[in-house]
UniProtKB/Swiss-Prot annotation:
NCBIfam families the UniProt entry points to: PLP_synth_Pdx2
Gene3D superfamilies per the UniProt record, alphabetical: 3.40.50.880
Entry keyword set: Glutamine amidotransferase, Hydrolase, Lyase, Pyridoxal phosphate
EC numbers, comma separated: 4.3.3.6, 3.5.1.2
Gene Ontology molecular functions: glutaminase activity; pyridoxal 5'-phosphate synthase (glutamine hydrolysing) activity
GO CC annotations, alphabetized: cytosol; glutaminase complex
Reactions that this protein is recorded to catalyse: aldehydo-D-ribose 5-phosphate + D-glyceraldehyde 3-phosphate + L-glutamine = pyridoxal 5'-phosphate + L-glutamate + phosphate + 3 H2O + H(+); L-glutamine + H2O = L-glutamate + NH4(+)
Name of the protein in its database record: Pyridoxal 5'-phosphate synthase subunit PdxT
Organism annotation: Methanoregula boonei (strain DSM 21154 / JCM 14090 / 6A8)
Catalytic site positions: 83, 175, 177
PROSITE patterns: PDXT_SNO_1, PDXT_SNO_2
Taxonomic lineage from the root: Archaea, Methanobacteriati, Methanobacteriota, Stenosarchaea group, Methanomicrobia
Subunit details: In the presence of PdxS, forms a dodecamer of heterodimers. Only shows activity in the heterodimer.
Length: 194
């Protein structure tokens, strides 16, 4: 079992640490690495890919520049996308500068929570997540304004939808990798049969 983290921008090391801990918690050893993905060759053998937050227009440009657009679209593993990663997963982002992957049929509102100084933390209820509410860190995040074609809504705030999943993909407007709560990472891995 190998997990890749798109290492073009964002909190890459935090995603690596969170997925490493989640894999160990699920009984996987050092033989199940979490690696940085910078080019198409790095995706080989990965069962999952995390797309971190950052700035969505920049990440989409770097995905194109590094030849990763088609390989990620064709990737057969699961994708765990946070913040800007959620934007890249959507079919409709409302900004022509963002070359989205279009893997989840949904519309997102970029920066729905405002500027960086308006970042906040909140306890949210996530559908089907045992153990009570989830403490979520929102940093200038998006919201989903419309989910279509089997995209399942997992969580909402008063601003809109902040967590979705469909099949092997999960997209979150917040940053679960910044807290110690691994339940969403574990749920994602479990959905992949890991």
């Amino acid at each position: 079992m190998k997990v890749g983290v798109l290492a073009l921008q964002g909190d890459v090391s935090e995603h690596i640490d969170a997925f490493t801990a989640a894999l160990r918690k699920r009984g996987y050893t050092e033989d199940s690495p979490v690696i940085e993905v910078r080019n198409p060759e790095d995706l080989a053998g990965c069962a999952a890919l995390a797309i971190p937050g950052g700035e969505s227009t920049t990440i989409s440009r770097l995905v194109d520049k590094n030849g990763l657009y088609k390989p990620i679209r064709d990737f057969k593993g699961g994708i765990f996308a946070t913040c800007a990663g959620m934007i890249l997963m959507a079919t409709d982002v409302g900004d022509p500068r963002v070359h989205s992957l279009g893997l989840l049929d949904m519309t997102v509102d970029r920066n729905a929570f405002g500027r960086q100084r308006e970042s906040f933390e909140a306890d949210i209820r996530v559908q089907g997540l045992d153990g009570g509410s989830f403490h979520a860190v929102f940093i200038r995040g998006p919201v989903v304004t419309e989910a279509r074609d089997g995209v399942v809504v997992l969580a909402r705030t008063d601003k809109g939808i902040v967590a979705v999943e469909k099949g092997r993909h999960m997209a979150l407007a917040f940053h679960p990798e910044l807290g110690g709560d691994l339940r969403l990472h574990e749920r994602f891995l479990k959905n992949l049969g890991v």
